[in-house]
Design a protein with these regions (language model features):
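A short Gly-Trp-Pro
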Residues: 1-132
Length: 132
């Protein structure tokens, strides 16, 4: 099964060759600030399962993390840990159809904005658990 996604203007497109391994709502301040949102929902897939089909994202490295944005319009697309080359995270909202991908965990609740309501049925973590 494949899943397609891309940026807001259509200049950058990708295909995921597998279902996400993890679906996480991240409330950390870095994700909030880079996305301009109260939190970001990430999916994780094996690196080899991400295929760019149009355009190439611009990568910005900071604090052992690499965030990738559409060079054409700035849409936040990917997140990589500089030390973990096995997986890559993608923004669920950048999928053409994000509806099947409900969150499985909430992380970095120590940075959560006070008015954000967390689904109490989700496993929640103060920071990042060992395996997300």
């Amino acid at each position: 099964m494949e899943f397609t996604g891309g940026c807001v203007c259509g200049g950058t497109r990708y295909v995921l060759k597998s279902r996400p391994l993890a679906l996480v709502d991240c409330h950390c301040i870095d994700c909030r600030r880079s996305a301009g949102a109260p939190y970001v929902q990430w999916g994780s897939v094996p690196r080899e399962d991400v295929v760019m089909t149009k355009g190439e994202p611009r990568k910005i490295a900071y604090a052992n993390r690499i965030r990738s944005f559409a060079a054409c319009c700035g849409t936040h697309l990917f997140f990589e840990d500089a030390k973990d080359s096995d997986t890559i995270d993608f923004t669920i909202a950048s999928l053409d159809d994000p509806t099947p991908f409900a969150p499985q965990k909430a992380i970095w609740l120590e940075d959560k904005l006070p008015w954000v309501v967390i689904d109490e049925s989700l496993p929640s973590f103060h920071t990042t658990p060992k395996k997300v």
